[in-house]
């Protein structure tokens, strides 16, 4: 569905038939569906449309999360915030996703109330249940975590995760002895443990070789008795700091080999992570994720996963459309907004497959690499049921 009222969308789909079901009847029927039915459809769609591209032998996946404000529902304690200091109450869901940067499709997604959100734990679960091989997982500072790095290592994947910079007193970098230079590439071979003894305290003086973890770690014992032997988990990685502008730097950790992936290559790869940020914007505003047609959270789950399927379908249809014109400065790609509309018309039976590709090829936009602008952080709100496009 698009951004109109539920009645408008039903009239649009059924062709203004006088026998059309009412909005109330539609809501009652959708209530009979399992809340996770569309999640299963999304997983099935991903498995059956998995034709990926590789970069230096790796499949590039980005992980990130995004908050979704939904219609106010005090009856859902996992997402409801009463507001404070004069702020109106609101409900938030949290979407965690893995996104293929070269195929430009979502490979996995998890949705829950904001109060229950734990991005790192969710991503660990996504890594564990994935059937993919030769993956390089790229993530931002929210995923700086030894436990997550271990899950990725155990899976046989590679990781590239941005961490808090060396100037920050917290985080992975703060617990290591690093070079004094502005830029560096240091290999660290850490032995992690959750046990605390006098012997271990002496070992931990070598901060680049031994590390005591205060939190639970999935690959170490949950409890440690006094006479139990010390158990270590080995986690080798590089910590790399590189310049991104005249006066700013980024620090990342990775288990990629330095010969194939020197610092400049890591910088390029991490910059590619922006593709998942762009996908969230298109998912919300082009595909219409913010235009819900329900208040019940289980119905909203259906709509979120339906739009993820729609996003993936549109990207798969448009991905072959890259046009290089000899007399033009830029290569051209499909206009995603037009492509979404054409794909919707295809599902409605108004456009045949040959015309879908022809229409998409007719509406293209130039590819302008290297552009950037300051990111404006503003509050996002669910679109009211009252103010909808007719």
Question: Which residues make up each language-model segment?
Answer:
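Polyanion/phosphate-binding surface patch
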Residues: 8
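Extracytosolic and intramembrane catalytic regions of membrane-associated proteins
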Residues: 81
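Conserved beta-strand elements of the Class I
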Residues: 59-61
């Amino acid at each position: 569905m698009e951004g109109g009222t539920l009645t408008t969308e039903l009239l649009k789909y059924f062709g203004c038939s006088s026998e059309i079901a009412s909005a109330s009847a539609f809501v009652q029927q959708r209530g009979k569906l399992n809340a996770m039915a569309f999640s299963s459809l999304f997983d099935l769609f991903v498995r059956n449309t998995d034709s990926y591209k590789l970069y230096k032998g790796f499949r590039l996946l980005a992980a990130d999360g995004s908050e979704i404000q939904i219609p106010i529902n005090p009856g859902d304690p996992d997402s409801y915030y009463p507001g404070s200091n004069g702020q109106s109450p609101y409900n938030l869901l949290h979407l965690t996703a893995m996104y293929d940067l070269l195929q430009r499709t979502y490979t996995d997604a998890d949705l829950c109330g904001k109060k229950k959100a734990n991005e790192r734990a969710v991503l660990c679960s996504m890594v564990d249940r994935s059937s993919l091989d030769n993956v390089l997982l790229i993530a931002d500072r929210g995923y700086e975590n030894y436990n997550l790095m271990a899950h990725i290592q155990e899976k046989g994947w590679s990781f590239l995760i941005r961490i808090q910079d060396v100037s920050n007193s917290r985080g992975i970098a703060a617990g290591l002895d690093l070079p004094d230079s502005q830029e560096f590439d240091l290999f660290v071979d850490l032995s992690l443990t959750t046990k605390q003894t006098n012997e271990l305290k002496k070992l931990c003086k070598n901060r680049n070789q031994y590390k005591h973890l205060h939190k639970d770690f999935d690959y170490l014992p949950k409890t440690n008795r006094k006479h139990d032997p010390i158990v270590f988990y080995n986690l080798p990685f590089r910590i790399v700091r590189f310049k991104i502008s005249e006066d700013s730097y980024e620090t990342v950790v990775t288990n990629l080999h330095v010969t194939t992936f020197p610092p400049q290559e890591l910088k390029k790869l991490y910059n590619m992570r922006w593709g998942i940020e762009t996908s969230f914007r298109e998912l919300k505003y082009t595909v219409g994720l913010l235009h819900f047609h329900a208040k019940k959270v289980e119905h909203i789950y259906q709509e979120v996963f339906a739009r993820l399927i729609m996003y993936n379908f549109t990207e798969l249809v448009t991905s072959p459309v890259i046009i290089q014109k000899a007399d033009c400065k830029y290569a051209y790609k499909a206009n995603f907004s037009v492509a979404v509309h054409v794909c919707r018309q295809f599902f409605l039976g108004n456009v045949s497959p040959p015309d879908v590709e022809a229409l998409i090829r007719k509406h293209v936009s130039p590819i302008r690499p290297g552009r950037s602008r300051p990111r404006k952080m503003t509050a996002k709100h669910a679109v009211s049921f009252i103010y909808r496009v007719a």
